[in-house]
Amino acid sequence: MPVEVIPVLHNVSSVQRVVDMARLSYSLGLDTLVVTKAYGGAAQSGVPEAMRLALKLGKSLVVLPELRDAVNLLSPTHVLAVTPSRAERLVGPGGLEGLEGRVLVVFSGGEPELDPSEAAGAIRVYIEGVEGKVGPIAEAALILYFLLRGGGDGRG
């Protein structure tokens, strides 16, 4: 079964972070980006700018109030939570074994990583060979690339 990868940017206030995540996701060939719990500048300017980009490219941007809404509405087979300090599995150039169906990959939009309650029930992952937090856009670039190129076509 092919893998459909959908990135989720959660708990974000930065305009630039939303726009950069949209550019990254769409440039990797992904059709959908989900933004949850956007507030401040991200909600006022980042989401509209990302929506403009999505419409221009024929892609989708889904904006929801909470992470659980994305999980409930998109019904993923797997949820991967990017948690540098509590990773159970590492994602490297070979992708991640055992993934199939729809996979949500949740990146924290702020400096603190995902709260343990937000990552509950998810597979906690980080990047093979990277020590410490490098920021959500760098994490997304590496993890999404590895998932998409490591095994099967994960374009969603």
Swiss-Prot record:
Enzyme class: hydrolase
Coiled-coil stretches noted in the UniProt entry, renumbered to this chain: none
Keyword Magnesium tagged: no
Gene Ontology MF terms in the entry: DNA binding; endonuclease activity
Keywords associated with the record: DNA-binding, Endonuclease, Hydrolase, Nuclease, Restriction system
GO biological process, one term: DNA restriction-modification system
The enzyme's E.C. designation: 3.1.21.4
InterPro entries in alphabetical order: DUF2122_RecB-nuclease-rel (IPR018665)
One Pfam family cited in the UniProt record for this chain: DUF2122
Domain of life the protein comes from: Archaea
Reactions mediated catalytically: Endonucleolytic cleavage of DNA to give specific double-stranded fragments with terminal 5'-phosphates
Function description: A putative type II restriction enzyme, its methylase would be APE_2002.
Family of the protein in this entry: To M.jannaschii MJ1199.
Protein name per its UniProtKB record: Putative type II restriction enzyme ApeKORF2002P
Naturally occurring in which organism (per UniProt): Aeropyrum pernix (strain ATCC 700893 / DSM 11879 / JCM 9820 / NBRC 100138 / K1)
